[in-house]
Every structure is written in structure tokens, then in C-alpha cells.
Amino acid sequence: MQVDLQSSAQSAHALHLFHQHSPLVHCMTNDVVQTFTANTLLALGASPAMVIETEEASQFAAIASALLINVGTLTQLRAQSMCAAVEQAKSSQTPWTLDPVAVGALDYRRRFCLELLPHKPTAIRGNASEIMALAGIANGGRGVDTTDAAANAIPAAQTLARETGAIVVVTGEMDYVTDGHRIIGIHGGDPLMTKVVGTGCALSAVVAACCALPGDTLENVASACHWMKQAGERAVARSEGPGSFVPHFLDALWQLTQEVQA
């Protein structure tokens, strides 16, 4: 199994495209991470919108550059809104990304996510336990936390990618991105990133935005992982702990965009 490493040059090119296109991202994400997700997208040059009402969600999915479905705080009413948005995204050819938070641990959200898969997500982003559960290989995870190493989920990610046509991202100490055939690995980041709520969810929003960019979607999605890990490393170097990490992380994302424009 060959894993190609993401190049800094490709990531810089994708970030330049990102800034040029400034994707409008419809984030149907969980209540815990909305502000952090929006600020992450803004720092990179995208435009976030958090539209959740069923009638509006369907309408907005048609005009957005990309749609994110994150089931972290799923309710039946929210599920209805998400279904309406996904159906409209499919009709409007709006790329959409699924973040199957904690599907390995909870039955309702696992059933809901499995019902969404026939609508052909452009990308799926999760930790190892989530991806393995969604692929039907194993159920597990401790809530939103993984109990499996990212590398162990590569076969499940490849299977899921081939079955759905999605780019599948498995995040961990090393991230892996696959279309079912090619596999790209992304080094970096820091364990402190796991002590801040929302870093994975925010990555899913950036992945969604990258699905709206022209060019190689696999490379663009891998670039999203690279930016987040780069920014995480820079932020940790300036931080004293989780509390000071967040502002330094947002600053680091902003600085990355400034560097590619210089």
C-alpha cells in the first residue's frame, strides 16, 4: 500500500486558489463548534454561513459554494433540515461533505449517516473509529474520540471511497486522504490540538470549502489537512495551553494565507 506525502508546493498552490475563490460554505454543523468553525473559515479567506431552518437550508444549499453536514449535535428536526439541504445540493450540484461525528458509538446518527451516503457526498472526514464504523467494518470509538489508529482505517477509507465516490479523510497523528485508489499522507500537527474542541469539525468545514475549488479534489482536500496541521504547529509553539492555542491558531491560518499572496 503506497502512501504519497502531501507536498508543500501543492498545498501553497491550493491555498492560493482558496483565497482567489473565497468559497461560500454552508455549515450545518454542531452547536459546540459554530464560532470556531466560522472563524477558521474566515481566517483562511472563505465565507461561512450557518443556516439550519429547513426551508432556508434547502434554499441556501443551492447558492452556496459547498455544504457541510456535521452530525455532532444531531436532533430529529435538524436531521430533516440536513436531508433537505443534501437533496438540494445534489440537485444543484453543490459539493457536500459529511462529518459523521461519533457514528461508531451511537445508533441513530449511524443510521442517519448511512441514509445520506446514497446522495453521494463529495468528501467524508472522520477519525479512524468513525470511518471504520461508516464503512461497516467495526463499531467503536469513545463518543467523539477514536479508539483506533488512523493507519488502521486506511482499508476502510478506501472501501468507503470506492463505494460512495467520495474523497475520504481519516484524521489522526498522521492524516490520510484517499479516493479509493491513491492515498496521500499528511504529517504534522500536535497532540495539543486534541485538547481543543472543534479542530476536527473545523477541518471538515475547510475540506468542504476545498471541494468547491477547481483542479484535483484529492490534492485540494489533502491541502486542507496540511494547512490545519501547519497552523497547529505554529500555534503550539506560541501557546501555553489550550486557552491560548485558539487565538494563535487563527492567527497562524491568517498568516499562511498572507504568505502565499506575498
Curated annotation (Swiss-Prot):
Residues that hold substrate according to the record: 50, 198
Keywords linked to the UniProt accession: ATP-binding, Kinase, Magnesium, Metal-binding, Nucleotide-binding, Thiamine biosynthesis, Transferase
Record's function text: Catalyzes the phosphorylation of the hydroxyl group of 4-methyl-5-beta-hydroxyethylthiazole (THZ).
Lineage of producing organism: Bacteria, Pseudomonadati, Pseudomonadota, Gammaproteobacteria, Enterobacterales
Xref: InterPro entries: Hyethyz_kinase (IPR000417), Ribokinase-like (IPR029056)
Gene source species: Shigella boydii serotype 4 (strain Sb227)
Gene Ontology MF terms in the entry: ATP binding; hydroxyethylthiazole kinase activity; magnesium ion binding
Protein name: Hydroxyethylthiazole kinase
Gene3D superfamilies attached to this UniProt entry: 3.40.1190.20
Catalytic reactions on record: 5-(2-hydroxyethyl)-4-methylthiazole + ATP = 4-methyl-5-(2-phosphooxyethyl)-thiazole + ADP + H(+)
